[in-house]
């Protein structure tokens, strides 16, 4: 704030704008999203030439607002601000903000299920980042790639990435935040592999993947300590959410809910949305369990609603079902809505895991859905729950 005051007093518009936008970025990292957006708006006013087109240096403020709007799940507004910020930053030769703006574009494409456009944008960002030497952006793009591959069920490619970069994950030569992002990408691979093994090959769930979850949780403990020590609350929330997913994959629901509860308590005052819903169906299961336990019920219900709204590939809810569910299928569906895993449903109903999977597949087929979140949303719209 002192640099803002001094540069403003000296009439240095560019320095004032840069210092103000930098303050907004710091506030965002501290988890103060509402303060950050107000700071970026102040920067926009500084960059405004009496109602004419803003000066190129205002691009950094536009991109900052775009990132916050994305977190709040206002995708259309995020696109608008990102594109404006990219255009201004290109005019001003500010490559770092061009990269940040295009990162928002990649995230929005991913959120909308536009996989091809997301991959293409990631490729463009990677090329530019490599050309100009931005290791953090390269690590950020790797994480987005991992999320896209996992969403596609392409664990082979994600696992190959993990093998290829295993040495660099512990490379102390890269900047700390890039190192953190790489480790987060690695954790995502380990969680996805474990969840896949638990659902497809239950007899192997406790063998190599148990060790992988120990590795993932070990990485997350280190990351959490670093983020807490430096006051980066936004990273703390993200890491806690991943911790919850890792504990869930390990079968430790108590620890999973504890980590999720901490994340929600930090996130609720600032209205975080995408940090949670970008994790997809595994997070939806945890959120349903949190709602059932009365943890931040209003906030969690809103997150679940955002998740269900984002299931664009689901059917129109007004369409009636052509074939009704059996009593057993309804029973399974209610347990799914309560957040129980396949294994927990099997124990609850005293049936084989394969039978649970068969019932769930029948439910999906009859309801015309592809995921638990879509099934629960459809059932709620039809008054079945």
Where are these regions (language model features)?
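Helix-turn-helix DNA-binding segment
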Residues: 308, 312-361, 365-370, 374-385
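Helix-coil-helix junctions within alpha-helical repeat/solenoid scaffolds
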Residues: 1-10, 19-314, 359
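Transmembrane helices and adjacent periplasmic/lumenal helix-loop junctions
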Residues: 13
